[in-house]
Amino acid sequence: MNKKTSGQAIAWLICALVAAAQYGNFYVYDSIGPVADLLQQQRGFSDTQVGLLNAIYSLPNVVLILVGGVLVDRFGAAKMTVSTAAVCLAGALLTAFSPDFTGMAAGRLLFGIGAETFSIATLAAITDYFSGGKLAFAMGLTLSIGRLGSYSADMSPDWFSHAYGQGWQPPLLIAAAVAGTSFAAGLLYWWIDRPARRSAAARRANAERFVLRDLLHFGRAYWYLLALCVLWYSVILAFRSTFSIKYFQHVHGLDLATAGAMNSYVFLAAVFATPAFGWLCDRVRRYAPFLALGALLLPVALAIMTLSSLSLWVATALIGVSYSLVPAVMWPLTSKLVKPNRFGTAIGLMWVVQNAGIAGANMVAGWLNDRAGASAQNPAGYDAMMVFFGTASTIGAACALILWLTAGRRQQEAAAQPA
């Protein structure tokens, strides 16, 4: 095996380890939704409290995600991957073993503190080992395998029915065990990366400072994209990760296992479709039209789910396409709208606002459900939540359409000069 072949093998091994670590991260994040009904039945949690368990994940990242990027640049991807994976594991354990809501919320907060910086670190890890045409594919592959963690969390009521039959805690203990495998993968990556520490040093030397005045240089197209980012992610993650399984059970009469399976297909479709959509957009060199299509599918799917008698499979399929298409296009398009030396600032700002939006959407949706008395006995109580999600996703789709019409025509994308 020559040096080049050996280097490629190590790169793909790192990719596999990072993907395995991301799998655990996604699983733990989505572990609350499947036990939401059990938490209400056995521990008396309200919808507001259940929503807060996911909302609190995002709250620290309104600020800390900027700090996390600086720490990754300073200490390197490998060290930050393993250290933040350890924080995530501690958060998952605290969530599973806490005797009350306050302890569980503290565990989810701790998990959130580690998880987003963990994601930045794994992104930097892929960047260290891949370049050129393979970079996007490696990132897409890592994200896709990570999303299998969300699929697995949704399928866990079926796969681990015995654990769910024993109450709310065993499923969360399984999530903590999965977080342990994530930490183990991160630790192995850190050990393999030891000879390549100079890569981290080079990245630290080239790191750019976050300067607030750089925001003044972004064009209107970027702000349309940022608005779509916060609205679209807030709706799809708050609904899918927190409330969808209960909604399917109480409004559409599904049992827990079937509701979890229905919800899981959104992520299962994205596992295969996201890299494919990314390849297609690169192939035809068009981004804004695909982004507008993906954004528009979300309010359409929510309307079908709420207002029509069509099968839930239709709505979940449309959500799956939206969840595959929008992320595949959003991040490459961002690189076309801002200059390379401002790309980190642009992404950092988008993630900050996105986390604030996700936290807010979870809390608002939970409050609306509690206010309306949403339950299996009162399925109409979920209407206010669905109107909220539908309105936000429609505004997001409008931003995507405006972006397409003002800066996303074929000739404009071909001649794009980052602002």
Residue ranges and their predicted role:
Residues D30, S58-L66, S150-Y151, F267-P275, ...:
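Residue-level signature of mid-helix packing/kink "hotspots" within the transmembrane helices
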Residues Y287-L333:
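C-terminal transmembrane helical hairpin of 12-TM major facilitator-type secondary transporters
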Residues I32-P34, R220-T274, A361-N362:
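Extracytoplasmic gate region of multi-pass secondary transporters
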Residues L141-R194:
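Helix-loop-helix hairpin linking two adjacent transmembrane segments in secondary transporters
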Residues L64-G76, A273-R286, N369-D370:
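Helix-to-loop junctions at the C-terminal end of transmembrane segments
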Residues V63-T102:
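Conserved MFS/SLC helix-loop-helix module at the cytosolic interface between two early adjacent transmembrane helices
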Residues F101, G107-G146:
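Cytoplasmic helix-loop-helix junction between adjacent transmembrane helices
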Residues N2-Q8, D193-L226, A419:
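Juxtamembrane intracellular "pre-TM" segments in multi-pass secondary transporters
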